[in-house]
From Swiss-Prot:
Residues annotated as site: Transition state stabilizer: K168
Quaternary structure note: Homodimer.
InterPro entries reported for this sequence: SSO1393, SSO1393-like, SSO1393-like_WHD
Alphabetized NCBIfam families for the sequence: CRSPR_nucase, putative CRISPR-associated protein, APE2256 family
Single annotated GO MF: lyase activity
Organism: Saccharolobus solfataricus (strain ATCC 35092 / DSM 1617 / JCM 11322 / P2) (Sulfolobus solfataricus)
Name by which UniProt lists this protein: CRISPR system ring nuclease SSO1393
Coiled coil: none
GO cellular component: cytoplasm
Enzyme Commission number(s) of this protein: 4.6.1.-
Entry similarity comment: Belongs to the cOA ring nuclease family.
């Protein structure tokens, strides 16, 4: 099976405005620039309220225009032809953001592909709307897209990433992470000369020394004190400079969530640390494999007036007096 992974932008919405009937309806709904709406624009709700009628209208538009209706369809069908892929062997894995305009475009494109005899699936990922939630969006991309690429490869499918549509920061990250996950080919359709270009898609991996440090970190606990990291030979300050770990409190470091997801490509399920570590100021640390025992010990030290830090498999707590 040839799996094409493709993000969904809003070119369909923009192009549909060239149709007089569509444009009049969109203007009537007060959605003139509906392809450029921000995630928090109140008009997203208007799209949601009229979702079914808009979906039917756009599907009719696509049927009349075919692949020219959107960047997704144009690049996909051009690549099917260039690579001589048979419809019966194609599976298109689409992903849109969780905004109403992107979801609308995604559903219509998926439905059209199915009408054309091409198996297709659509998933929704979180919108990246600011620097603050960038990494949250990347984590969601791992959960819903990158791990699916891994699964497709485990099932001996060929995986092709369409880098043409969608938002560029996510497309760049998807391309890199997709290659790490074993994607076979990256392609892009240049509108300037109306042709699909197969991009260099070398097998890539994390530098061995960084991978060793990160795996050692993950197996030892997703949060480590600086002292413990030094004992393990992990240069946490270098990893912090590379934005792979983040500082928690004065002397603790934690793997960033997206790095934990990235390590899922390399670590088997269950390889992460499951211990509970309690660090008491002035007394060192103790490790427990039972949450109740760790909690009881922590409480006893806290009642003694000690500052306590508790590290559990996926987070860290600081408890004062």
């Amino acid at each position: 099976m040839e799996v094409h992974v493709c993000s969904v932008g809003t070119s369909l919405l923009k192009n549909s405005l060239d149709d007089d009937n569509v444009r009049k309806e969109i203007e009537r709904l007060g959605l003139k620039d509906w392809d450029r709406l921000k995630f928090d624009d109140d008009r997203q709700n208007r799209i949601k309220e009229n979702f079914d009628s808009l979906r039917k209208m756009l599907l009719k538009f696509i049927r009349s225009k075919g692949r020219r209706a959107s960047a997704e369809l144009d690049s996909l069908f051009s690549t099917f032809e260039k690579l001589k892929h048979n419809k019966s062997e194609i599976y298109v894995f689409l992903y849109s953001t969780n905004t109403s305009n992107s979801q609308l475009a995604g559903e219509v494109i998926r439905d059209y592909l199915i009408e054309e005899g091409i198996r297709s699936e659509l998933v929704t990922v979180k919108t990246i709307s600011s620097e603050e939630n960038f990494y949250e969006g990347i984590v969601d991309l791992f959960d819903k897209v990158i791990y699916r690429i891994l699964k497709f490869k485990e099932q001996d499918n060929e995986v092709y990433i369409n880098a043409t549509p969608g938002l560029k920061p996510e497309s760049i990250f998807l391309t890199l992470a997709g290659l790490l996950a074993g994607a076979d080919l990256i392609y892009y359709k240049y509108q300037e000369f109306n042709d699909v270009v197969i991009l260099p898609s070398p097998p890539i991996t994390i530098r061995p020394k960084y991978l060793d440090w990160l795996i050692r970190f993950a197996i030892s606990g997703y949060t480590l004190s600086e002292k413990r990291a030094e004992e393990l030979g992990i240069p946490v300050r270098l990893l912090e400079a590379k934005m792979l770990v983040e500082r928690k409190g004065e002397d603790a470091y934690r793997l960033k969530d997206w790095v934990r997801k990235l390590l899922g490509i390399y670590l088997p399920i269950g390889a992460q640390n499951k211990y509970y570590r309690v660090i008491v100021e002035g007394e060192g640390e103790r490790t427990f494999d039972n949450e109740v025992e760790a909690y009881n010990y922590m409480e006893s030290k806290r009642k003694e007036g000690k500052n306590v830090r508790v590290e559990v498999p996926d987070r860290v707590y600081f408890l004062g007096l």
